Amino acid sequence: MTFNEANTVEAFIRDLLCGGVTDHTAAGPGLASHNSQLAGLGWHYLSHHDLPRQPQEALVEDHLRESLIRLNPAIAANPDRADDVIYQLRAIIMGVRSDGLVKANEAFADWLTGEKSMPFGENGEHVTIKLIDFDDLEQNQYVVTQQYTFQAGPITKRADLVLLINGMPLVLIEAKTPVRASQSWLDGALQVNDDYERNIP
């Protein structure tokens, strides 16, 4: 067998997170388990083919919509409201090119940390929107996937591993092979900076 990034470092990290790949591809809320024991670090593995998204979409909107409904009673009362929140998040992502990465990250972080609200309450009162449940972590959906492709115009990039929480890609991992001395962690860091930060929101 030829050793490469996919079957050494990438597979090791994936298996550490999810306890190994199985035929089971359902990824509901809560930590992954097998026979009532935590699987790896509790992440569910889904192949990038099994994620309901197009390459030009940064978010896995079906998963995000389900999470918004599950975590927010005001959205559960009217599930169409989830689309209003997704629209706001999409606008931040699409604004990266004009507003800059730092400003977009700050705006998205405000949503992630529960600092944003929408007029979904009684008489149009603003209620805080939860994208992640920090109080009950079992309410969140944790997915690790490999070869997550994102296309921005003519540019297509593929990350080795991506960690998604509630349909949002929050961690990008660029694995480098331990068997090629010419590749190091610095190469991975430069690739993330040069390829992803400059070209992909």
Annotate each predicted stretch with a short phrase:
Residues 1-201:
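An alpha-helical interface "stripe"
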